[in-house]
Amino acid sequence: GLGANIFSSAYGEVVEVTEDRIIIKPDEEQKDEFVPIEEGSKLDMVKAAGVVGMGGAGFPTGVKLGTDLEGGYILINAAECEPGLRHNIQQIEEECVKVIRGVKYSMEISNAAKAIFAIKKKNTKAVQTLKEALKDEPAISIHLLPDIYPMGEERAVVRECLGIEL
């Protein structure tokens, strides 16, 4: 199915499972160590870690990455559709090397030949940071989006970057 592994930060006993939560009675003694993810392929490790998308559906990232793109491309939606949000832009400005490393892993796992960052023109610092970080990455490009709302919506991003109507 489309499920994903779920982890807890507390050792204990599961005492109740409801539609929207899992109740754990914590052990009196909590261990400091964590249970490591078993070594394996990058895709297997993403699946084992229970990584999910940040959208409301929590779609399993392993399912997305498990698609063989056969030399296709990945779109990175950094448009920040909602006017008050800045988390994507902040990640690019502060952790650009890690973001690009994640994109390269995603390309490797999914067999993508190219990746495109979709980002609004108004985010000049993030755009400049990306340009500098990508100067030696010919397979990863930047597509500047217009500064209009709701330009972060996925169909609008696909239309703007690829000229495809979904």
Model-derived features with residue positions:
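Generic secondary-structure signature for well-ordered alpha-helical cores
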Residues: K47-V51, G56, A79-E80, K104-A112, ...
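Hydrophobic alpha-helical positions that pack around
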Residues: A113-L166
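Glycine- and charge-enriched low-complexity intrinsically disordered segments
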Residues: T18-A49
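Gly-rich Lys/Arg/Thr-decorated short loops/hinges at beta-loop-alpha junctions or inter-strand turns
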Residues: I74-N88
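Short coil/turn connectors at secondary-structure junctions
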Residues: E19-D20, K42, A48-A49, L69-G72, ...
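Short amphipathic alpha-helices and their capping/turn segments at secondary-structure boundaries
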Residues: A57-G71
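Generic structural motif
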Residues: G1, I6-E16
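Histidine-anchored nucleotide/phosphate-binding helix
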Residues: E93-I109
